Regions:
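Bacterial N-terminal signal peptides that target proteins for export
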Residues: 1-10
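Secondary-structure end/capping motifs
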Residues: 233-314
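Pocket-lining segment of extracytoplasmic ligand-binding domains
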Residues: 98, 178-269
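Short, glycine-/small- and polar/acidic-enriched structural segments
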Residues: 27-166, 172-174, 190-194, 209, ...
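Extracytoplasmic/secreted envelope proteins and their assembly/folding machinery
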Residues: 54-60, 82, 86, 97-100, ...
Length: 352
């Protein structure tokens, strides 16, 4: 008898609705999730997702001595955060590696100001444990679930290319993560291209195994993106610089306290603690803040060019035009290796 996923296990995925998906809905007002920290005359408006930057900063104690106010607005995913940044509804917000590409393609009013680099072990193509598929080349003619325009979509395209295939060689089924999990669990697709924490959840509850990871094909980057007018305001720019320093220290805290952060993250998102801890050790805690340098820009340009070729974005553009490097000082290069906790729940070498 095939094991089925109980509806309760699907709920956390609906709540998390991917930071790196370019087709997600959002609480555009941010009203219900809005709150304020700090003191002073200046207010920095920050776009966030549940269980992300605000939760990390609070857990690390980085919101205890703010010399300015932060007003938080909560969104369900990265794209609406960038819509808010572009519209001057927020000053800055954190997103994955794909939303800035789509926002820039739409000529949005944004500037990437900071980056963090993590392992790509959580960026995976999953198959069932009993699947006969052993390598990416075996996907030819098979069905693969993926969220359209997501980081996983790019990973699928790049992984297939590395194996000598094109996206036309597989049967792509565009599904958001919760729907993809259900389809994968019920054997309606042969494989699932996805990211953490969905990877960690599937490995624990869906009898999944990793066919390949994103190592060597995706850049493992996440970004902080600001509005240019906020950067032109000297006081706000100074606050943004301070905010980024706090994020860097908070990320260090996450790496040093994986269990403590996993408990908080699980409570924030509804994920089981074990899944949260797996994801922290596989992906979340491995991230280190790095410079938005030429290599980082080039890797994003590659994503943009790929999506333009697939006609997923309306135009080709120079990603460098949407970057502000003023906060790079003192940051290691984007090629800096992610941190590591050793082996997570399942670790496999990428297969070709």
């Amino acid at each position: 008898m095939r094991r089925r996923i109980a509806p309760a296990l699907l709920l956390p995925f609906a709540l998390l609705l991917a930071a790196c998906t370019a087709t997600s809905s959002a609480d555009d007002s941010g009203g219900a999730g809005s709150n304020t920290d700090g003191k002073g005359d200046l207010t920095l408006r920050v776009g966030d997702q549940k269980g992300n930057d605000e939760a990390v900063l609070r857990a690390a104690g980085e919101l205890d001595d703010l010399p300015y106010k932060i007003r938080w607005s909560t969104f369900t995913s990265g794209p609406p955060i960038l819509e808010a940044v572009s519209a001057k509804a927020v000053d800055i917000g954190g997103v994955g590696n794909t939303p800035p590409v789509f926002a820039a393609a739409a000529n949005s009013n944004i500037k990437v100001v900071a980056a963090k680099h993590g392992t790509a072990d959580g960026e995976t193509i999953l198959v069932k444990k009993g699947s006969p598929l052993k390598k990416v080349a075996d996907l030819k003619g098979k069905s693969v679930a993926v969220a359209q325009g997501s980081s996983a979509h790019y990973q699928l395209v790049a992984s297939l290319a590395k194996a000598g295939l094109s996206i036309k060689d597989v049967k792509v089924t565009f599904l958001q993560p919760a729907d993809a999990l259900a389809a994968f669990t019920r054997d309606r697709v042969d494989a699932w291209a996805i990211w953490d924490p969905y990877t960690s959840q599937a490995l624990r509850s869906a009898e999944a195994r990793i066919l390949t990871t994103g190592q060597g094909v995706v850049n493992g980057l996440n970004f902080q993106v600001a509005n240019p007018s906020s950067l032109d305001d000297k006081k706000k720019a100074k606050a943004i610089g301070d905010y980024l320093k706090r994020l860097r220290r908070a990320q260090d805290w996450v790496y040093k306290h994986p269990e403590a952060w996993a408990k908080i993250w699980a409570k924030e998102t509804g994920l089981p603690y074990e899944v949260a801890l797996d994801s922290v050790k596989r992906t979340n805690g491995t991230r280190v803040y790095v410079a938005v340098d030429k290599d980082a820009i080039a890797s994003e340009q590659k994503i943009a060019d790929t999506f333009a070729k697939l006609k997923l974005i309306p135009r080709r553009f120079a990603f460098a035009d949407y970057v502000d490097t003023r906060f790079n000082a003192g940051q290691p290069p984007s090629s800096t290796a992610p941190r590591s906790y050793g082996t997570a729940t399942e670790k496999t070498e990428p297969t070709k």
